[in-house]
Amino acid sequence: MSKTSKAYRAAAAKVDRTNLYTPLQAAKLAKETSSTKQDATVEVAIRLGVDPRKADQMVRGTVNLPHGTGKTARVAVFAVGEKADAAVAAGADVVGSDDLIERIQGGWLEFDAAIAAPDQMAKVGRIARVLGPRGLMPNPKTGTVTADVAKAVADIKGGKINFRVDKQANLHFVIGKASFDEKLLAENYGAAIDEVLRLKPSSSKGRYLKKITVSTTTGPGIPVDPSITRNFAGE
């Protein structure tokens, strides 16, 4: 939705920019301000009090949302033999090795997450420059380089999300769809915030959660009170 459109302006008028909403209030308002006919994705943006240029202040992690994302992720798996068979059985959308790498080198990127068996990483490194900037490069820290590829596929299909701080110290992640009940959105939000807090670098000084905004992909940003770190689904 264009920020100059009549529908967007009407939605934005419902948001009090001077107010800090509870996660539950923000989830409810996000649903109300989504005017698209499609089931919009609900997203969270966080400004962190870290310096991403410092290696010891890189915030990166994964979390299994208790109520899923509302979207079935398309998963690519780099594996051969029994691991490839296990990935297929677990529901992977595409499984391969050299053939899959060549396909990606040719421009194919129709997947949302990538998993690799450890013995495939030397090969996958050939497409790191393609996958890395898109947040698709398998990494042991996010559980996407693993011998148990079947579990990794099941986790991602079940609502596991990844997040990583960008160069501007922002985090972005999905907590569900506008069709979700606001309480479920708030509980997903809480699960993600819990993990972000757990990953706070010891070298980070001052306020860690500086600014939090909830919105749908087409709606206005709704400011959330960053001091709320428990009872996320409460009024």
UniProtKB/Swiss-Prot annotation:
It comes from Mycobacterium bovis (strain ATCC BAA-935 / AF2122/97). Belongs to the universal ribosomal protein uL1 family. SUPFAM superfamilies: Ribosomal protein L1 (SSF56808). The keyword rRNA-binding applies. GO terms for biological process: regulation of translation; translation. InterPro entries: Ribosom_uL1_bac-type, Ribosomal_uL1, Ribosomal_uL1-like, Ribosomal_uL1/biogenesis, Ribosomal_uL1_3-a/b-sand, Ribosomal_uL1_CS. GO terms for molecular function: rRNA binding; structural constituent of ribosome; tRNA binding. Part of the 50S ribosomal subunit. This is Large ribosomal subunit protein uL1. One of its GO terms (cellular component) is large ribosomal subunit. Binds directly to 23S rRNA. The L1 stalk is quite mobile in the ribosome, and is involved in E site tRNA release. Protein L1 is also a translational repressor protein, it controls the translation of the L11 operon by binding to its mRNA. Keywords: Repressor, Ribonucleoprotein, Ribosomal protein, RNA-binding, rRNA-binding, Translation regulation, tRNA-binding. HAMAP family: Ribosomal_uL1_B (MF_01318_B).
